[in-house]
Curated annotation (Swiss-Prot):
ATP binds at residues 524-532, 547. Its main location: membrane. Belongs to the protein kinase superfamily. Ser/Thr protein kinase family. GO terms for molecular function: ATP binding; protein serine/threonine kinase activity; transmembrane receptor protein tyrosine kinase activity. This is Putative receptor-like protein kinase At5g39000. Residues 1-21 form the signal peptide. It comes from Arabidopsis thaliana (Mouse-ear cress). Residues 472-494, 813-843 are annotated as: Disordered. One of its GO terms (biological process) is response to metal ion. Glycans are attached at residues 49, 64, 138, 168, 216, 266, 300, 340, 437.
Amino acid sequence: MIRHALLIFSILVSTPIVGEGATSTYEPTDVFLFNCGDTSNNVDVSGRNWTAENQKILSSNLVNASFTAQASYQESGVSQIPYMTARIFRSEFTYSFPVTPGSNFLRLYFYPTRYGSQFNAVKSFFSVKVNGFTLLNNFSADLTVKASKPQTEFIIKEFIIPVYQTLNLTFTPSLDSLAFVNGIEIVSIPNRFYSKGGFDDVITNVGSSVDFHIENSTAFETVYRLNVGGKTVGDSGMFRRWVSDDEIILSESSGISPIVPDIKINYTEKTPSYVAPDDVYATSRSMGNADHPEQNLNFNLTWLFTVDAGFSYLVRLHFCETLSEVNKEGQRVFSIFIENQTATLEMDVFRMSGGSWIPMYLDYTVIAGSGSGRRHDLRLDLHPLVSINPKYYDAILNGVEILKMNDPDGNLAGPNPDPLVSPDLIPNRATPRIRKNKSHILPITLAVVGSLVVLAMFVVGVLVIMKKKKKSKPSTNSSWCPLPHGTDSTNTKPAKSLPADLCRRFSIFEIKSATNDFEDKLIIGVGGFGSVYKGQIDGGATLVAVKRLEITSNQGAKEFETELEMLSKLRHVHLVSLIGYCDEDNEMVLVYEYMPHGTLKDHLFRRDKTSDPPLSWKRRLEICIGAARGLQYLHTGAKYTIIHRDIKTTNILLDENFVTKVSDFGLSRVGPTSASQTHVSTVVKGTFGYLDPEYYRRQVLTEKSDVYSFGVVLLEVLCCRPIRMQSVPPEQADLIRWVKSNYRRGTVDQIIDSDLSADITSTSLEKFCEIAVRCVQDRGMERPPMNDVVWALEFALQLHETAKKKNDNVESLDLMPSGEVGTTTDGEDDLFSRTTGHVGKSTTTDDSVLVVGDERSGSSWGVFSEINEPKAR
């Protein structure tokens, strides 16, 4: 169930807010409400005073950069103030607000409609910045409103901005567009209100043993603020709106909202009255089933929050024990899970708060998603903790706040959402509605509706008949189809080598036969796309891997189509081969060649170390070389550069002969298509830990992003440990930093996989580490192309085999395609380079010499790829 975050701040301003939280005592030092484009002060329906813009806050280029206009039409539910007037910007325009130093709520009000003949806000795209923070980038208020659920006509964007003297708010129209705003609200908030932590002054970093610290200079965007189990309420201090969670909670596990008699919330110094109003702490959602509490063990209380992937989020949970039957510790205890990770194992509200009707709140931080899509469903689950044998198998929650934190570049902007329905099916809000005579409209409407009903009944009848015929004669044959789909062929004979632009189209009957109707015991892998089954086709003659799209998959049909199109046109010994696909009966299935030896990760992190032997150093090098050649082909062997975007150990497969196959092309992207392009700009997708930091920061994608991910794989191959670990000293927690640190000190041999200590040779290790560390440089321009990576890995293998044969102990060697060897420096990349001159004159610390192809005349060069003489594509 996907609900867009926009519903939170699209509350009808015309509806009076109930339950104002009378006990709120915070009085903000600054409260500004500006009705943009208006020339006089006005009062809105809730009694708040909005002032007209004045010269003190307006930019000096007022006349040239902007103009004001009135909305041509007022939709039902849209209030007069502040939405019926707007300031519209032709060019960059800045408001300057003198405010008291500290953090402030900044709320921007937008009503995308037509404003006279001069401006249609539906076509408006613009950016908004405040004091160095990017709040919105190429923002479309119209697309944002259309994607809201439930549908609204306007949107309020709320931010929290640290201000030291002046709040400078800048609107910048996108190319060939105009910017606009209807209202601006600024409200100061208590010192460190969202940065100090929960009532216990702690911010739990989900998935880490180290608590999180939020700097006072951090900016936030409010994404959700929920009154769990209750109705929409407000508070008088900071004018926040707490929205019902009915649209967010999963319907199948919605629990109950207990009705509690009038109670008094006992606020404390740790949880003062301005944290949340009475109505939030007096209402809640619990699991219920008092007569059969054991049923609560079969499900969770679950909320799904649709957010922008790739950002860090502050999740604030509000609790208050209001059930009179819970009157001592240990009676209602539950666990909190965020993003399927344990946030709090043992949550006892009565014990932690100090008793009944005493509110408390806890703060957590989490990174949402893996950059694999524009949107991500951040998941919150509550489940009874059985291990301590509580009196009630139950859980409770009163309120939720979710705030997005700015990234290292000061960015809070996410991409524009896709509309939930086709724009052609949405009434055009940009055109004022013409009020016609109702006496003419009614008979026309009845006639149209009647015709549509008859037509719909006819279509349904035809579909039912066709479905019955289809069931009586099921399709059992596959066909070969070009992409996009063409006329089916009756040829079902499997081909040894598929044409580059063809793949086999299976019937759902064949797929179910191949997998025993998707039998669970045949599952050999699970990923973001869905489950992968081991199957047999063509009467058991061919083993295949069958990847089935799950309905709840975050990746979905777009990635299905991407992988189908990519792999149907790409053929390489080190790319997994696509045999075919199926898209019948609402199923999306891809069929690949079967990889008996599974993934590289399976062999690095062996489950049964007694029966599964470790990979030798030679085997690891061969696997890495195969994967590198596959990437090299993607980057330089096709018509255009193809960027994989999700290179990791689980996407490197091994066949029966341990030949490497790069897999999973659902996130792949075609790179620059002309010489004038150096990159493509795109939403960040990939897997954290493997994600190129430069790509993450700038959203600029090049083939060097794949190089970074592959470098992380090389480090895993070398050290055989996860990218991030918690049960180690802080300096060892991050694999990349840990290896770089040891690389600088010359102690990499002390952190390699213990299974390699007696197998790996020093010269091979040095060359391998050199190229691996170069791959994971922070700046893309400092990383090598895949041509160089392949060459270096092949050289590392040659050094290993030579040393094994001759039993030499060469301490140092470097080789460059130019025939020159670099001199020693203190930089990371040159730690192992201690030789000078031609490669034929390499000297080592023990005076032994290894001559490898002096002046490229030796035969040893034959073991390397032809990329020693790289040619332009």
